[in-house]
């Protein structure tokens, strides 16, 4: 399973976890990916896609 949004192409973000004493350790911020069935008008059927929650929110706003 790829950790990439099939609709927007979003991938994980590299960052730092900063402690109280300001020690920095590398941290990976993953994308919130969910499986969602999306209706395809071209193929005239449901397609199961792995998309980010932001993409789901955008799709529901468009409808």
From Swiss-Prot:
The source's domain of life comes to: Eukaryota
A Pfam family for this UniProt protein? Ribosomal_L28
Enumerate the SUPFAM superfamilies for this protein: L28p-like
Coiled-coil positions? none
Tell me where in or outside the cell this protein is found: Plastid, Chloroplast
InterPro entries reported in the protein's UniProt record: Ribosomal_bL28, Ribosomal_bL28/bL31-like_sf, Ribosomal_bL28_bact-type, Ribosomal_bL28_sf
A single GO CC term, please? ribonucleoprotein complex
Keyword entries, A-Z? Chloroplast, Plastid, Ribonucleoprotein, Ribosomal protein
Q: Name one GO biological process term.
A: translation
List, in alphabetical order, the Gene Ontology terms for molecular function in this entry: structural constituent of ribosome
State the family named in the UniProt similarity comment for this chain: Belongs to the bacterial ribosomal protein bL28 family.
Instruction: Supply the name of the protein.
Output: Large ribosomal subunit protein bL28c
Q: Which organism is it from?
A: Porphyra purpurea
């Amino acid at each position: 399973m790829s950790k990439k949004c099939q609709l927007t192409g979003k991938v994980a973000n590299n960052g730092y976890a900063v402690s109280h004493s300001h020690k920095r350790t590398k941290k990976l911020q993953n994308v919130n990916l969910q499986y969602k069935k999306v209706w395809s008008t071209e193929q005239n059927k449901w397609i199961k896609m792995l998309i980010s929650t932001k993409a789901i929110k955008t799709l529901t706003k468009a409808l």
